[in-house]
UniProtKB/Swiss-Prot annotation:
Record topology, Mitochondrial matrix segments: 25-111
TM ranges: 4-24
Name of the gene encoding the protein in the UniProt record: dnj-21
PANTHER family documented for this protein: GEO10507P1-RELATED, PTHR12763
Organism name: Caenorhabditis briggsae
Sample GO molecular function, one term: ATPase activator activity
Membrane topology annotation: Single-pass membrane protein
Location in the cell: Mitochondrion inner membrane
Mitochondrial intermembrane compartment spans: 1-3
Protein's name in the database: Mitochondrial import inner membrane translocase subunit TIM14
Entries under CDD domains matching the protein: DnaJ (cd06257)
Record function comment: Probable component of the PAM complex, a complex required for the translocation of transit peptide-containing proteins from the inner membrane into the mitochondrial matrix in an ATP-dependent manner. May act as a co-chaperone that stimulate the ATP-dependent activity.
Amino acid sequence: MTGGLIAAGLGLAAVGFGARYVLRNQALIKKGMEALPVAGGLNSYYRGGFDQKMSRSEAAKILGITPSAKPAKIKDAHKKVMIVNHPDRGGSPYLAAKINEAKDLMESTKS
């Protein structure tokens, strides 16, 4: 019982000192937050579903490569994406089919 009260008191003291630090150094913290990089990954998110007939550029986006990638790079990218999305490991069968379709399209068409 006493140990719990001591822990609660120490917790409240820590929160109080933390809040005091933040309030006193608010300008410094704000400047530091502005210096942090903006989350660029959210801005480059592809906002759209799959096309009816997959294009070479869509296949490249699915695999995370350029449309003019070499066959070795296509194979490596397919392997990495399939390891993460394989249906036997909890991935979606639909996404796995699209990934395989993208690989087949990239390997069959010439840039």
